[in-house]
Amino acid sequence: MDMDMDTSPSYFDPEALSVRDQFRRYRKRHSTSPHEEMLSSNVSENRLLYDGHNIHSPTNTALLLENIKEEVDNFHTDHYEGTPTNPISASRRESVGILNDDDEALFRRVESQSLKACKIENDELAESGDTTFALFASLFDSALQGLMSIPNLMLRLEESCRNVSQSIRYGSDIRHRAVEDKLMRQKAQLLLGEAASWSLLWNLYGKGTDEVPENLILIPSTSHLEACQFVLNDHTAQLCLRIVMWLEELASKSLDLERKVQGSHVGTYLPNAGVWHHTQRYLKKNGSNADTLHHLDFDAPTREHARLLPDDYKQDESVLEDVWTLIRAGRIEEACDLCRSAGQSWRAATLCPFSGMDMFPSIEALVKNGENRTLQAIEQESGFGNQLRLWKWASYCASEKIAEQDGGKHEVAVFATQCSNLNRMLPICTDWESACWAMAKSWLDVQVDLELAQSKPGLTERFKSCIDESPEATQNGCQASFGPEDWPLHVLNQQPRDLPALLQKLHSGEMVHEAVVRGCKEQHRQIQMNLMLGDISHLLDIIWSWIAPLEDDQSNFRPHGDPHMIKFGAHMVLVLRLLFTDEINDSFKEKLNNVGDLILHMYAMFLFSKQHEELVGIYASQLARHRCIELFVHMMELRMHSSVHVKYKIFLSAMEYLSFSPVDDLHGNFEEIVDRVLSRSREIKLAKYDPSIDVAEQHRQQSLQKAIAIQWLCFTPPSTIKDVKDVTSKLLLRSLMHSNILFREFALIAMWRVPATPVGAHTLLSYLAEPLKQLSENPDTLEDYVSENLQEFQDWNEYYSCDAKYRNWLKFQLENAEVTELSEEENQKAVVAAKETLDSSLSLLLRQDNPWMTFLEDHVFESEEYLFLELHATAMLCLPSGECLRPDATVCAALMSALYSSVSEEVVLDRQLMVNVSISSRDSYCIEVVLRCLAIKGDGLGPHNANDGGILSAVAAAGFKGSDIYGTYFSFTYDLPPFSIEIWGCELTRFQAGVTMDISRLDAWYSSKEGSLETPATYIVRGLCRRCCLPELVLRSMQVSVSLMESGNPPEDHDELIELVASDETGFLSLFSRQQLQEFMLFEREYRMSQLELQEELSSP
């Protein structure tokens, strides 16, 4: 990708404080309504098909029947497979994104591989993921609709992660094997890491910033009040404060969990556990020795350079370890209570020196202290901040003295926390969170101390000179001479200079525990450190680097927790987009859109691979327009042969979260998705034929694949969407339009007189039965544009009904031919089938008011210079046996010449007819035929009253009908009393006899002089269908009539059929080829001969 991976926007630079202040990283507190959670939980349930108790309004009969079937099949199971666990409400907010060429190439590479990769990834997180997919989607859906504030969303995400983690780790009493238990611990830990990241994001970007209450502003001010105001206004200090509070909050929640699970936590000791009972008894009994202290006051071990007895020492260290743990969790009061209960009230006094006041520099601590004026009184007497500096200096001296005498490490650390003595805290910080807390808290306290020291004259210059010196010079040169008035020079050079230096110290500091260094390499720690730095750009890059397919192995994910990171990354992208709406520059906006779309796309396909199709729409709706469309098209194609239930979930997901029609250039919409699906379903696929099965038959079966695509338009849209009636009408219109296109193609490959039913056409009819039934129940929704397409659909419905009855009759004929003697019942069945076939065919052929397949054109061009017509066809050449003729250059050239010869040379010149035949680039068994000619009045210009498709239809019909031995452009007369029929038409010449074209795709267009296609010329294809279907229907009727006559059941309307063909008014004669008319006359001859034979039998005695 053409993006700078090492830089971030300037407003995320921790050094550029003024810019960061303008960015308003810390927002004003939002007022949270108690109704928000209720709103988010009461999201519309209309979107679920089945929620465990009720079936929700899918009106499609096929879908309802399949739901019932699945319920019966799964009657004894507790979980309904494929059903979402939580109701998801509609989302209308979408994101924007623009890719450059490199990003687009990367996106397409990922799209082509990600679904396969998602399918074979490790399923370690499947169990826990199933409980969070729908939950997280529901939360984000509520946030996108404005039902939940963004800060509240972050808190809910953290809470959800914690709850699921606890459920995995402690929710089951079942004993697991060692490997399973390890995996469950890993899952729970990953979710805790995610919860920590959400908590940090809330502390940094979601938590409000309170102002100092007016009633707490004191005059003269106090050191604590000044410290709180400084931290409130200084960006770096505020950042440190929030990091410290975040880490203390994590530690506190960990203690609560320990108490919840184990029933107890730190500090649960017997009273007076720290009174050194063993040492007391030893002194009373044995006196003392050199190594044992002589007095029992709290300062005795340090003053006498002596030790407690081992048992008391261990007990004391245990108490101090718990005191440290409570301080680390921000529970100072509990730590003081522990000290008092252990008999060490003096230690509690060292923790809270100012009458128990909380001296933490936060507004919360200030409010907690209330209007207490103790500190103000103290500082009025001793001077501003003097007592505070004295206390910290004393704590520093104590920590150093105890450390020098190898005292307890926790006692050293407890004193060190009071004075920012980082070097004495880090040795007991054996995890990343503790080390980060120690550094951030020390740095925060020193920043506050430096600010408070500004009131002392001359001290500022000493601070600057001390900072300029190296840490070694400061440590060895003048630190020993520092007194309380010099605070905080004693610990100044222990602190980082900025936040990147703090994080670098975590990575490679000499005093940092190796476990801390290892923790820096964990994924969520890296995420959290980038959030602290505000380097969101780099954060997106590293998340994408973790989940992107490997360059050398596109079929697999990297084996380090990618499913979890995909989910987290997608949700992080959505939160960041909601947070940074108007406050970002173009470069960062581009990064957030580009890389964010890649991550969202990956997660959407991951959900798809886990059969959570109903959740995909929430995330897909946030993708850029083209990505959203491509994603849904890809999913629909992969689920093309899935159950109705699964396909309906995808349909609902798209309908609910996307607009139906295009709204702008940024957002995806259902119309474009379904148009792309339908268009791609008609494309010629790369040839993959089974050599053991006839290629031509496999080619005809492709019609089923085209028909299945129409089902996406036949579902009932949910009643919750906007303008549902209008959407329903548009779906019906598109389904009718596309079905008519397919019906035309299917009719041209269903000319073979075999019993097999054309599966594609009848699949279309079955899909459209339900929408048309609903249309009949609501006739008010029928608009003119729907009516026109509906009329053609009804024509095709009638035609395929005739076709089905003919094939049913043909089936009887073939079955009866194998039996020597038929029973009366079998004969009667054949006769009934024949009469039904003949009656339905004549009903279609004899229509007077609205002849079959004759309509007014949508686009009628009266006059236009250089308007051309084009017909594009992809077809397979078939021998008379039905087998495929594989084309080569010679065959193509011969067919092209034959098509030219099917019309006169005068027509070729006048109409500028051009014919091109070539082998298909995608299927070597198929040919591509392109016909082009000049439009003239009556054929392209003005109304087309002949309804025969014009010259292009005539040339194409010659190819579909094939050639006989005498193929040419002909005109002659048949005389067969009592009728005289003049014959003319187009035939192929100089081409193999009996070879016909089986259509794969057929389109006709109006085109410009330059060859650009303008609008469809539907009349050409309809006319072609009339040229091919009506003569075939007549011939089939003749075949059935002959059969009835031979069986002694003469049809009543045979002469009417002959008159229909011979009549000039119907124009049927122009639709026949010479070969078809020859067959027609042969059938008529057979009919007359059978009639004479029957008359002779009846007249004979």
From Swiss-Prot:
GO CC, any one term: nuclear envelope
UniProt record, GO biological process: mRNA transport; protein transport
Compartments in which it is found: Nucleus envelope; Nucleus, Nuclear pore complex
Main localization (coarse): nucleus
Coiled-coil ranges per UniProt: none
The entry's keywords: mRNA transport, Nuclear pore complex, Nucleus, Protein transport, Translocation, Transport
GO molecular function: structural constituent of nuclear pore
Pfam family, one: Nup84_Nup100
Subunit-structure text: Part of the nuclear pore complex (NPC). The NPC has an eight-fold symmetrical structure comprising a central transport channel and two rings, the cytoplasmic and nuclear rings, to which eight filaments are attached. The cytoplasmic filaments have loose ends, while the nuclear filaments are joined in a distal ring, forming a nuclear basket. NPCs are highly dynamic in configuration and composition, and can be devided in 3 subcomplexes, the NUP62 subcomplex, the NUP107-160 subcomplex and the NUP93 subcomplex, containing approximately 30 different nucleoporin proteins.
Similarity section: Belongs to the nucleoporin Nup84/Nup107 family.
Protein name per UniProt: Nuclear pore complex protein NUP107
Gene name as annotated: NUP107
